[in-house]
């Protein structure tokens, strides 16, 4: 079974290497980089064009893109797994505040350069539980430019995208929202998304993990992906 793995902001496809290494050969796990230079909807569509008919697994920003793809192209998405992701920001004022915050980050990246920006980004409390040796800092530096980072902030950020909460009831299963138990915000979001989609959706919580579940606990992430494939093929 084909599985397409989509990384989050500042990450490259290489972020999925620890998970892919733990998946069996019968799962054709393909990690892709997020295209740049396109709008949010067009980026999601481009991921589907590259990935084809598959189970899609997205982390954070990559998860928001995969959700958009699943809603727009249910014929392409055989199953959807979202790690530490949301459907966007429903409240207009909160969304505007997020756009302002992301614009500030973009200006900082343009002013300070990629190395300083990535160092600050990974020092956020959001990544407090992410071991430095699992962060993949060198891959992030090699796989990004200031232009790609600022485009992602200004065009692909949660403040820029159309919120998808109202479309969740249209999402066709299987759908699996995942969050680390130490990431309380996204635990709540996982349960809220599940409730919107329907009674057959049950979130998975990864014990002892924070926001970057796939980096902090690749073994548990691979195990839940193996289970998804088993459920689809049994």
Regions found by a protein language model. Name each.
Residues 71, 78-110:
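Flexible "cap/lid" loop of the alpha/beta hydrolase fold
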Residues 209-218, 222:
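Catalytic histidine-centered segment of alpha/beta-hydrolase-like enzymes
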Residues 142-195, 205:
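Conserved serine/cysteine hydrolase catalytic core
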Residues 1-38:
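Conserved HGGG/HGGXW glycine-rich cap/lid loop of the alpha/beta-hydrolase fold
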Residues 195-211:
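Catalytic histidine neighborhood in serine/cysteine hydrolases
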Residues 58-62, 66:
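Gly/Ala-rich beta-loop-alpha elbow adjacent to hydrolase catalytic centers
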Residues 56-58, 83:
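Short beta-strand immediately N-terminal to the catalytic nucleophile in serine-hydrolase-like folds
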Residues 93, 108-167:
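Conserved alpha/beta-hydrolase catalytic His-Asp/Glu region
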């Amino acid at each position: 079974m084909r599985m397409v793995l989509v990384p989050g902001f500042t990450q490259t496809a290489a972020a999925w290497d620890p998970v892919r290494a733990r998946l069996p050969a019968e799962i054709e796990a393909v990690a892709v980089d997020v295209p740049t230079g396109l709008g949010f909807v067009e980026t999601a569509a481009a991921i589907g064009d590259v990935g084809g008919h598959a189970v899609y697994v997205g982390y954070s920003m990559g998860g928001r893109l995969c959700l958009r793809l699943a809603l727009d192209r249910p014929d392409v998405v055989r199953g959807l797994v979202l790690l530490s992701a949301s459907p966007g920001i429903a409240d207009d004022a909160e969304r505007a505040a997020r756009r302002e915050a992301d614009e500030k980050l973009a200006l900082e990246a343009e002013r300070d350069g990629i190395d300083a920006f990535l160092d600050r980004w990974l020092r956020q409390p959001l990544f407090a539980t992410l071991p430095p040796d699992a962060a993949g800092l060198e891959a992030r530096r090699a796989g990004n430019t200031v232009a790609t980072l600022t485009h992602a902030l200004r065009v692909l950020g949660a403040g820029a995208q159309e919120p998808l909460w109202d479309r969740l009831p249209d999402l066709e299963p299987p759908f699996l929202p995942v969050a680390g138990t130490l990431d309380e915000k996204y635990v709540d979001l996982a349960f809220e998304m599940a409730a919107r989609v329907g009674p057959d959706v049950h979130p998975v919580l990864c014990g002892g993990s924070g926001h970057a579940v796939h980096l902090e606990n690749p073994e548990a992430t691979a195990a839940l992906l193996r289970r998804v494939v088993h459920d689809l093929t049994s």
